[in-house]
Amino acid sequence: DSINLSDELQLDFYSNSSVVTAVRHLIKERRLDTAVNKPEALYVSLTDMVHKNRLVIPFFNEHDVIEFYQTRTVLNKDHKIKPKYLGKVNAEKTLFNIDRVSSDHDCVYIFEGPINAFFTKNSVAVAGITERGKSFTQRQEEQLNTTLKYYDKTWILDSQWVDQASLV
C-alpha cells in the first residue's frame, strides 16, 4: 500500500493528499531528492496501522532486495506523540545503503541514521545505537564482517554518542 514518491503517475494520483504533500515538502526541504547517496525511491503509506503518514526509507540488502525499512514522522501533530523513527515490525535491522557501497573506494563511512548517509558517497547507516552499547543486530554484524570486511571504516555518530563512542 506504499506510494512510491519517485513515480510521477502515483504522485499525480495522490496530488490532493495533504500527507503526500507534507512528505514531499520534507524531502525537498532536507534535499533528500538530490542527495548523492539517496536510495532509488522513498515511500509513504496512507493506511498502514504502524507506519501511516510517515516517510518510508527502504533498506536494500546486498542483492538489491528490501530487507528492512525505517519510517520517520512527518506531520507536526505526530512529532510530540509518536516516535521520530520506527523500524519494520518484527524484523532484524540491516545496514542502510549496503547495496550502494562501491569497491571503487577503500573506505566506507558508517553513520547512525540513514538520512545522514544520504549525503556521503560509500556510506551506510546502522539505524540507531542503543544506550547499552550494543549497537548491531546479528544481521548487521554479518554484513560488517562479510560485505564490508575489507573496507577501512570511518564511524560518524550523532553528537549524543561522542563521549561514549570509545567505549563501544
What are these regions (language model features)?
Residues L144, L167-V168:
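Intrinsically disordered, low-complexity Ser/Thr/Pro-rich tracts
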Residues G133-T137, L157-L167:
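Acidic, metal-coordinating catalytic cores used for nucleic-acid/nucleotide bond scission
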Residues S18-V19, E112, Q164:
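Residue-level preference for nonpolar/small residues embedded in alpha-helices
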Residues V44, S123, G128-T130, V162, ...:
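Compositionally biased non-globular segments, especially hydrophobic aliphatic-rich helices
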Residues D1-V56, F60-H63, S102-S103:
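TOPRIM metal-binding catalytic domain and adjacent DNA-binding surface shared by DnaG-type primases
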Residues T154:
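Short beta-strand-alpha-helix junction that forms the catalytic/metal-binding core
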Residues L26, D48-Y151:
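Phosphate-handling DNA/RNA-contact segment within nucleic-acid enzymes
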Residues A22, A35, A41, A91, ...:
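A sequence-composition feature that detects small, non-aromatic residues
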